[in-house]
Amino acid sequence: NVGIGTTAPSSKAILDLTSTTKGLLLPRMTTTQRDAITSPDAGLIIYNTTSNKLNFYNGSAWEVVTSL
């Protein structure tokens, strides 16, 4: 596991980000750029700058994250 901002990352996480002043910035792209990804893996997440929404690939189609 990898820790960023921590010397003791959680053993339950592959990536543990710790900060009280910064956030996580996901890859940002347009719908056209998103659709150009060949064979995306299920679970892939991007921030769509065309719609200003989070998108994830469900294994067969892109969907909008509607509620967190």
Describe the role of every protein-language-model region.
Residues T7-S10, M29-T31, T50-K53, G59-A61:
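Acidic glycine-/aspartate-rich tracts in secreted/extracellular proteins
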Residues G3-G5, G43, G59:
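Glycine-centered flexibility sites
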Residues D16-L17, G59:
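Short amphipathic alpha-helical segments
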Residues L17-S51, T66-L68:
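Extracellular/surface-exposed low-complexity repeats and stalk/linker segments enriched in Gly/Pro
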Residues N1-D16:
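Short sequence segments immediately N-terminal to proteolytic processing junctions that release a mature
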